[in-house]
Each structure stands twice: as structure tokens, then as C-alpha cells.
Amino acid sequence: MLHCIQTIVAMINGYMNKIAWVDLSEKKIEYHEVDEDEALKFIGGRGLGGRILVKNCVGKDPLSPENLLAVMTGPLTGSDVPMANRIVAVTRSPLTGAFADSHCGGYAGPALKLAGFDGIVLTGASEEPVYLVAKNGELSIEDAKGLWGKTTFDAYQSIRRKYGATAVFYGIGPAGENLVRFANIMHFSRFATGGRASGRCGTGAVMGSKKVKCLVFLADMKRKPKPADKEGFKKALADALTKIKESDITGPGKGGLSVYGTGVLVNTINELAAFPTRNAKETQFEDAYYISGENLKGTILKKTPTCYKCPVACKRDVEVKEGKFKHKSEGPEYETLWSLGAMIGLGHVEAVAYLNYLANLYGLDTIELGNTLAVATEASEMGLIEEKIRWGDADKYAELVRKLIYREEEIGDLLAEGGAAAAEKLGVPEISMSVKKLSIPAYDPRGLKGMGLTYATSNRGACHLRAYAVSSEVFGVPYKTDPLSYDGKVDVVITLERLFAFVDSLNLCKFSTFALSKENYVVLYSTFTGVEITEDDLEKIGERIWTQERYFNQLHGFSRKDDVLPKRFFEEPSAKGEVYDRDAFERMLDEYYEKHKYNSDGTIPEETLRELGIL
């Protein structure tokens, strides 16, 4: 029996009060109201989706019909709040076996909300390919046999021709259909013509296992949610916009994100010797400038689109006009410039952009893809696979991408399982730069000590978006800390993981945290929903959401033994002679568990779970 959130949200503004539960095995759809108590405790998005997962998916195989995929919005989604444009897919990851939430910008979140839903929960599995259409508070299941096998972009074009230019696509490519364990979910719309991605954790494989090609959202602006406190919200909105516009990071036309996109970080992180290169055997890339945001702007940049209600416009659309890398697509973000650049020794921005284009076209997580190719290259150097793969060989990497998408040959099937599984099968798990089988992003913890604790304790594996310690270590937000010091990093990580859990459950872009304070989020939420909360409430909600996710992992056997880092970071020095100190790492874990009220083995005592209202 599925435990659905059923009690009506009668007094909280910002909800459509409708979550569609789809039994794909039986082709049945039920509509459930949103429980007010759950909404107050877990908000929406990542938090409410996580609640659904904890109640229904413990012990379920990630690629079985019993697993579910919850596609969720938050109470501010679709409103005038700047950067409240995200959508999130929540499930149990087929890549890691752990909690998974994968976020996407653009317009998919607002479109789902304006189609009349707070979320759609997919259960069971269809025997034949289908897609779902959300419109005016109703959901229909449609035949997708004509879409199955198409790339993400071709599938979107088919949907657009059938439903019109305003149709919003959120779906998978051949990688998801073929159950590649790091397949993503791609989004296309008039606000995301080049594409956006729910990239991490293999959510696209879960959608593919259910034989769902895509969700289609047909929005109605008449459904746009309005604030409970009109005048209070107007002031809160003005304050937030002023801060975003005045920030050196987010300011339109002047902030680094606006002028150069996320690629502005490439040179900065490289100079810190924190830019993992050639599978993190090195920490500085000699060709970093050529894959930087500065060089991208001067070479292949075509336009700088923005997501719905976002003044920052950090996105880059690119075009390579001729040659073997000819294409037009959403440009590579910082993480992709690194993962398909430095991590595999490739310093050619046109080639990096082309590999990114292939990933978007076929539906792959670019971070996991780059790490997986890095594992393959190092394994080739070690003579463990027959394929001859050299660092920086763009043509060979493009060939491998196509093979793994369709699981062609032994090498394609091996790499489709992800970098950690591939390394383990080859007998060298130590060459996978991963935590809980999720590969690292573009920050080497040897040069950014806070990121080591972030990766190790993250509920979804090595992830920079659980608690972006770089924010403190590089940007001084919310306060400055020394990148090479271990002191104070536990407090930084806990502060950010709670803030990010709250922001993710509102479904706001986390780039807003570079400019906005906790007070801003509290006032925006309070004036819009009509529910008065304090900064202490924000902290408690974030702690509850975070701990709920860790509890889900605990129920699947995760504990301190999984809060680890690849041994390369402990044993092999960076370009500046830095390693990650094991004793300092263990001390930080002890402090982290103590401040969270966990047991020393990283498990959560029942008392803590009850105190937070999780049990």
C-alpha cells in the first residue's frame, strides 16, 4: 500500500493542492491533496519528495517497478520570486543505491505548477513506452512508441509540433531507455531552447525503467500563485532583487556568473591547485584557460539565455560552425568544462562543448560521464582493458560515449554502469574518484578542505550541492574561511547543508544563496505562504530534511563506513604539496556526528529522529 500525502492544505498559500499518483502498471491515475503538517515540516520539492520516498521505497530495487520517481515543485515555484524556477526528481538512485534528488532550472518547475500540480509521482512500470501530459489540473497517459528511441531534442521537437510552441518537455534520451545508470532527465522549452538537465544520480534510468519517455507540461498563467501578504511580499521581493543585482557574483551584466557563466570558476579553482586533472592524478590543468568561461565567451558563445524569472542569466548557448565538432547546444557549465575537459586531459573548448552536446542529446550526466571516461583512460594505461584510450583523445571519447549509451560491446556495457562500478569490476576500485559510488565534481579536496567533508557526508554521494563549502573558502559567503584549514569547516558544512535543504525544498536556484541571507528566505516564504517562520525554523526544517535523507540511506545499510574519500586524496600530493590529512578527517567526522546528534558510527538514534518529527 502506498502512503500518500492526503490531508488538504487549507491554510498555506502557494500550493496547487494536487499531487498526481500514477500507477503505470495499471494505467491508473489518482489525485491526492497535500498534507498540511507534511508541507509545514518538509515544505515541498526535495523535502516533500523525500518524505514520499521514505514512506514508500525502503528496500525497493532502484530499477524495479516498486521504486518511485517523484517529480516535485515548491510553494514559491511559478511565482515572481527571482530564481524560483527549479524542478526536482526524487528517487532511489540506480547508480548508488542511496537517496537521490536531481534538480533542473529553466521552466519545467513553473510549467508543472501552472499546469495545476505540486508534483507527479510515478509508480509501477508500463509494458509499452508512454508519456504523460499535464494540463489544467488533469493528467493523461499517452502512447510514446513513436518517441521511443529518439534523442531528447528530437523527442522535444515532436512534442512541440503536436502541442505547440509553449509545450514543456521533461524526459529522457536513449541513455535512459537503455538503463545507463547515470542517465539524466533533460528539459526543453522556450526558456530552455538549448536544454537543461536534472543531471545527477541516474534519475533518467529510473524513468526509463518505467517506460516513460517524458512528461509534458502545458502551463496556464492564470494559475500563477499569488502571495498571501501582498504588500509584505512586494517589499521582500524588492529587497531580494536589490541584493541579487548588487552582488559581485550574481549582479546582471557585472557579476562573474552573468558575464562569464559558471565557467568563470575554471581559472580560479585551477590556481588553487584544486582542479582535478587526468582522474585527479594532478590538481592543475595546463590548458585550463582554453576551457574557461573567458575563452568560451570569446570563441563559441552564441547567446546568454536565462531561466524563468532569473535576472542573472548564467546560461551559455554555444555554436561551433564548422569542422567535426560542429553543433549548436546549451554550452557546457563549469562542472562540464572540467569533467569533459581537465578530468580527461582535454583542453579544446570546441571538443568539450561537443561531448557536452552528445551528453545532452542522448541524456547523460556530464559529471559522471567525465569521471567514467577518466576511469577508462587510467584503466587503459594500466593495461586492464583492450581499448587504447589516451588522455585528451576527443574522437575516442565520442566513440565511447556512443558505445555506452547503447551498451555496445563489452566496453560500452562496462562504462554504462558508471565509473565506480567499472573500476570495481576491473579490480581497481581506487581509481574511481567517488563517494558512495557517485563521482566527484570539479573541486579537489586537497586544495579545498571543506569540500572533503562535504563529499564524505553528502547523502547522495560526492556532491558539491549538498553543502558548497567553496562558497566560504573562495567567495567568503556566508563568511570567509581558509581553504587549506580544517578548522571551522564542520560548522560551515552544517550551516550550508541546512540552508540548501530548505532552498531546494522551495525549489529556488542555489545561486541565490550568494546574494540572499536566511532572513531573505524567511520573509519571502512567510509573506508568500502566509505561514510565519523564523530563521531558527528555517534551520530546523533544513536539519529535518537533511536527517530524513540520511535516515533513508541508513535503512539501506549506509553508515560511517560510507562517509569516506578516495584514498588518492589522502596519499598523493597536489601541485602545492597538499594531501588530505586522515587524522583531521576523522576528527571532523566525530565533530560532525556529535553536532548532528548522531551516534559515533554515523547512524541516527531514534531519539534524534523523533525530536525532528521524522518518526
Label each region the model flagged.
Residues 1-10:
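Short, Lys/Arg-enriched N-terminal segments with co-localized hydrophobic residues
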